[in-house]
Design a protein with these regions (language model features):
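Extended catalytic cores of very large enzyme megasubunits
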Residues: 1-426
């Protein structure tokens, strides 16, 4: 190895490469690990060094060299690579390995617009000092390499254009806790923060991506998923689309209850026009979902729900599959089919399921979620009303189609609406 190589430091100055320094860092990272060879990592990385190389690039080269050695026979290289990555991450965030005091860090990040001002409004400097005493920065060293890369890519507060990172994992955990418990009584909230921090940082509980990446920032995203109820009017459909764009940009996952939209061919304004059906509007929602990423963290995602008795259900069940054309498929959302006891009863008894457009059967859609006895009464009443447009299909055929699509796509879910209401706090 040519020891006369010049390296460019983070402050722009140059100096001769210090191989002993690299060896000491590797020695530190390998402490307590089994079946890892520092020499192997050094050999693999040294051949990639060149005159004028930046110290940051040296560090990334060493990390990659360690990661490339991860195997079933030598799994501990994942921890070697992770420790090196944590070292590098802290140098990028703080300019040094040791993290700063929590209060100083938060004050700086609030001033720079990276953290929510509420942190400094809700907590005193003394409370931040207490929170600082809860933090165990050594817990960073328990991460695997894959976990560090996930943190770096998705969860840590950063500039997603330049890649500049502003924090390390333990600050993430303690500040999420601080934000979540900020409105709790002052005499008890620090205890909650400590217990929550300990549980999250030791992986006893996990948090959804929008909470990990959004809470503590000016975006203030406290909900990981947002449910949007869509009505049967253009105003409601457009409001739904607008809400989707807003919440996707705020990092939330989307649930759309869109079963109220009337079926293809239904009259509009007393027959002045006929309805284009659900699919064009589902496409509209899909475009809204994919219009922006979840705050740069990941692509927007949505699950759209409709009732099994919707007149268009046979066309809706196949929206996700790879057959058909783009004109009659909406593949970039997931779907949930809403079912209740009556549908299962018809299946078990070998009966039919009658399909309706929600616009033709007043009160049926609301009763489907609110009152199962009333739903059954209205459903059988509308089945016997010859003036209402309907379609009968054998229950076994409809359930078979649903299960076939569910098996082939893996992304069609079942919501038992009666159980949702009797077995949840909502």
């Amino acid at each position: 190895m040519n020891q006369s190589l010049l390296v460019t430091k983070r402050d722009g100055s140059t100096e001769r490469i210090n191989l002993d320094k690299i060896h000491r860092v590797l020695d530190w990272a390998a402490e307590g690990l089994n079946n890892v060879s520092i020499s192997q990592v050094e050999l693999r990385s040294h051949i990639q060094f060149y005159d004028g190389i930046k110290t940051a690039d040296i560090h990334e080269t060493i990390i990659k060299a360690a990661a490339d050695l991860i195997s079933r026979e030598a799994p501990d290289y994942q921890y070697l690579a992770a420790r090196l990555a944590i070292f590098h991450l802290r140098k990028k965030a703080y300019g040094q390995f040791e993290p700063p005091a929590l209060f100083d860090h938060v004050s700086k990040m609030v001033k720079n617009g990276k953290y929510d001002t509420h942190l400094l409004e809700d907590y005193t400097e003394e409370e931040f000092k207490q929170m600082d005493s809860f933090i165990e920065h050594d817990r960073d060293m328990t991460f695997s390499y894959a976990a560090v890369k996930q943190l770096e890519g998705k969860y840590l507060v950063q500039n997603r254009v330049t890649g500049e990172i502003y924090e390390s994992a333990q600050f993430l955990y303690i500040l999420v806790a601080a934000c979540l418990f900020s409105n709790y009584p002052r005499e008890t909230r620090l205890d909650y923060i400590k217990r929550f921090y300990d549980a999250v940082s030791t992986f006893k509980i996990s948090l959804p991506t929008p909470i990990m990446s959004g809470v503590r920032t000016p975006t203030r995203q406290f909900s990981s998923c947002v449910l949007i109820e869509c009505g049967d009017s253009l105003d409601s459909i457009n409001a739904t689309s607008s809400a989707i764009v807003k919440y996707v940009s705020q990092r939330a996952g989307i649930g759309i209850n869109a079963g109220r939209i009337r079926a293809l061919g239904s009259p509009i304004r007393g027959g002045e026009a006929f309805h284009t059906g659900c699919i064009p509007f589902y496409k509209h929602f899909q475009t809204a979902v994919k219009s922006c990423s979840q705050g740069g963290v990941r692509g927007g995602a949505a699950t759209l729900f409709y009732p099994m008795w919707h007149l268009e259900v046979e066309s809706l069940l196949v929206l996700k599959n790879n057959r058909g054309t783009d004109a009659n498929r909406v593949r970039h959302m997931d779907y949930g089919v809403q079912i209740n006891k009556l549908m299962y009863t018809r299946l078990l008894k070998g009966g039919d399921i009658t399909l309706f457009s929600p616009s033709d059967v007043p009160g049926l859609y609301d009763a489907f979620f609110a009152d199962q006895d009333e739903f059954e009464r209205l459903y059988t009443q509308y089945e016997q009303d010859d003036s209402i447009r309907k379609q009968r299909i054998k229950a076994v055929e409809l359930f078979s189609l649903m299960m076939q699509e569910r098996a082939s796509t893996g992304r069609i879910y079942i919501q038992n609406v009666d159980h949702c209401n009797t077995h949840s706090p909502f």
